[in-house]
């Protein structure tokens, strides 16, 4: 069975408030995630919300990586969508554990665009 894309949806709970509010750190962490996944960044956009929260998007040649934070809820939502390769979600969670403080991760792997 062939698919057009692979979508990884990551929900992180019990995240550290101060880390979520450190916009520069979150931007660098997201860029390094793209590098760790061996993807090519072609565009990026980041927005700091007031009084708190952050959203970021990396357009990669393979598709996109996005992050949204809710410091008041100690929550991060990350999406990784690619049209070229599947990723080992365990390696991604290991990377996130090395770079973010959180208590619980929920991951959904979605195969997109089934081709007959």
UniProtKB/Swiss-Prot annotation:
It comes from the Bacteria. NCBIfam families: SAM_DCase_Bsu. Heterotetramer of two alpha and two beta chains arranged as a dimer of alpha/beta heterodimers. The active site is at residues 63, 68, 83. It is an enzyme of class 4 (lyase). It comes from Clostridium botulinum (strain Loch Maree / Type A3). Is synthesized initially as an inactive proenzyme. Formation of the active enzyme involves a self-maturation process in which the active site pyruvoyl group is generated from an internal serine residue via an autocatalytic post-translational modification. Two non-identical subunits are generated from the proenzyme in this reaction, and the pyruvate is formed at the N-terminus of the alpha chain, which is derived from the carboxyl end of the proenzyme. InterPro entries: AdoMetDC_fam_prok (IPR003826), S-AdoMet_deCO2ase_core (IPR016067), S-AdoMet_deCOase_pro-enz (IPR017716). The keyword Lyase applies. Catalyzes the decarboxylation of S-adenosylmethionine to S-adenosylmethioninamine (dcAdoMet), the propylamine donor required for the synthesis of the polyamines spermine and spermidine from the diamine putrescine. This is S-adenosylmethionine decarboxylase proenzyme. Its cofactor is pyruvate. GO terms for molecular function: adenosylmethionine decarboxylase activity. Pathway: Amine and polyamine biosynthesis; S-adenosylmethioninamine biosynthesis; S-adenosylmethioninamine from S-adenosyl-L-methionine: step 1/1. The record marks 62-63 as: Cleavage (non-hydrolytic). The modification Pyruvic acid (Ser) is found at residue 63.
């Amino acid at each position: 069975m062939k698919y057009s894309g692979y979508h990884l949806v990551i929900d992180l709970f019990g995240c550290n408030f101060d880390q979520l509010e450190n916009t520069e750190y979150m931007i660098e962490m997201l860029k390094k995630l793209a590098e760790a996944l061996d993807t090519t960044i072609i565009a990026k956009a980041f927005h700091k919300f007031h009084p708190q929260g952050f959203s970021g998007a990396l357009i990669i040649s393979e598709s996109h990586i996005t992050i949204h934070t809710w410091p008041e809820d100690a929550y991060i939502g990350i999406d990784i969508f690619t049209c070229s390769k599947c990723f080992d979600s365990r390696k991604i969670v290991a990377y996130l554990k090395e770079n973010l403080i959180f208590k619980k991760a929920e991951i959904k792997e979605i195969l997109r665009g089934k081709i007959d």
